[in-house]
């Protein structure tokens, strides 16, 4: 462990889903220029990773360069800190228990009874300090998922309490994100949930140095004094985190409220957040939010439309493009399980994102057909590419029974598998972490739409798939006007397709939304929106 390591711990209270990930990333952004910051997310669920969790239940699965499937908060970490995270930074209780049980079988506990304390907490501590050591970290931002009081989080809370004891209170600060409701009909902010949440944290031996109040409006002086009194913090250590037009306002708001100064004083460090560049981009986003110079309407036709977080990175990609092109992009989720062409007529562009399973397939194909036939700018992602190929095979090449092996039924052989299983996937039965995952090179064909967008013939993008375009059909596709414009480095797997005669009809097997940055938007989203203008 680095001698002068500083640690910021972010916990949540009252309710989940109020933005701990964005809050953690925003605080980290204030320190990124002066310290080597490493974000860590602790999740109490027993899954090894979120790779097999339905996006409707937990939000999108974020894929890293190293192939790790991690919590969606890592998208915020990467975008706010402009770094490439590692899968080891996502500590799940599933990983911890798995490691402990393996150690027990190997006899590493020397015959002792294996218990939650000290063995689980020691394993969590060991993992945290190993990350700090391997990354040569100067500051750790540790976000504990869920809310204080959740049974799943008790051991993580106890672990950070022990860490404070071991490294000294001058090297660690605790930040508690809470919710201050204003019930309808009362028109008054209520501090009691915050008080109870902090008391629960106090019972676990942790006393927050900073309380961040998530609310619809700035806290009144009366509520601020009450929280300060009953939660044992100074009034200036109670920070507003109100609803904003874009999440990129939050680090600027924290900067203006002196969050970096409060934490720097606690940790005895100096920091210069350098917030100017972000402020300029946020200014563009805000001005277009309130008085847009131009509005582009984009339909996202997906099967996980019940939860906005299912496609969080796609929506962030569009925000980044809007900031750089000085316009407002409005994205609307359309459920592909119940879709017809009439839903699409008001949109300037269409995105068909990734997904798994046959549910919602045909609705997505309707959207793709509509975009192709009406020359509507279109971007297909992962499954979106596969379905674009199926639609083209059926409606242009005349292969009416074209389909994917993902829809293969044991009692009904597939006659025209234009999409089939990757060779390396055959024989694999486990679902978790077994796909083609992570960053891989893609070779671009010159004089194509995508080559002109990227300006180079070799790129690195992130993948998450089991199926690919069947090469037996590529010649037929290209004779009918579809171009395979990107391949794997061995030229065996099609990674990008496009239809040159259309304004913008591009589909990729990878996920461009996973590497977008507000300062550098993903190229395919940039191309899509430019075609819509």
From Swiss-Prot:
InterPro entries, per database record: Class_I_gatase-like, CTP_synthase, CTP_synthase_N, GATASE, GATase1_CTP_Synthase, P-loop_NTPase
Protein name: CTP synthase
Lineage, highest ranks first: Bacteria, Pseudomonadati, Spirochaetota, Spirochaetia, Spirochaetales
Binding locations of L-glutamine: 355, 383-386, 406, 466
Key word ATP-binding present: yes
Gene3D superfamilies found in the cross-reference section: 3.40.50.880, P-loop containing nucleotide triphosphate hydrolases
SUPFAM superfamilies referenced in this protein's UniProt entry, alphabetically: Class I glutamine amidotransferase-like, P-loop containing nucleoside triphosphate hydrolases
Function description: Catalyzes the ATP-dependent amination of UTP to CTP with either L-glutamine or ammonia as the source of nitrogen. Regulates intracellular CTP levels through interactions with the four ribonucleotide triphosphates.
